[in-house]
Amino acid sequence: VTYLDELRDVIRRLHGVESTHVESVPIKETFQGKTVWEGIVEVFDLKNHPKAARIYAWAYERDNAKKPRHVTVLHMGPVTSPLLAVRAAIVQEYRNAEAES
């Protein structure tokens, strides 16, 4: 199973639709001069999704390298680019961490 196939499977499982890979976009997000996220965001077109025609997806390693964390962000509302998808995911993770503490 390739990385893109893995992401397609995650999209299918989470959103219930098929997807087609469009492009890979390198993103480097910095905050106060420090890199807070750097990686490749995969862009997919969605087939028959009720709210969005496109989705951004990526994975990153956590403590267990065999179980990466997969992230998907729908192209809707304020999220209109791979960079904005990364920013939205960072904000969401921060909020989740705040809620847990």
What are these regions (language model features)?
Residues 1-6, 65-101:
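Mixed-charge, Lys/Arg-enriched low-complexity segments
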Residues 1-24, 95:
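N-terminal export/targeting and maturation segments
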Residues 8, 12, 48-51, 66, ...:
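Low-complexity, compositionally biased segments
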Residues 20-84:
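Acidic, low-complexity, intrinsically disordered interaction modules
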